[in-house]
Amino acid sequence: MNRTLLSASVAEQGALRHTPAGLPALDVWLEHDSQLEEAGQMRRVRARLRAVAIGPVAERLASQPLGAQWRFEGFLAGSGAQASRVVFHIQDFQQD
C-alpha cells in the first residue's frame, strides 16, 4: 500500500503548467511541523517535501493562499529517472 496523509502548508508554488497529455499540473514545496510520540518520547518533526498535484486538484490548489494549513492525501513516487528522489503526489486536500 502507498497512501500518505500529511498536515502541511504550501511554502512555495510554481506556475500552473500542463503535462504532455494536456492535464494541469502544479509543483509545490510543502512544510510540515508537528510533535509526535516516538519510543515513549515526544519528538518535534519538521519536514520540507516536494509535491505535485495533477488535474482538477492542481487547479484548486493553485488558487489557495501560500502558508495556509491543509490536510493532504496522496502517494509517494520517485521523481522520473531519479527514483531516489521522492515526490508526494497530491490526490486531494482539505482544510486542516
Where on the chain are the PLM-derived regions?
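Single-stranded nucleic acid-binding surfaces, predominantly the OB-fold ssDNA-binding core
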Residues: 1-96
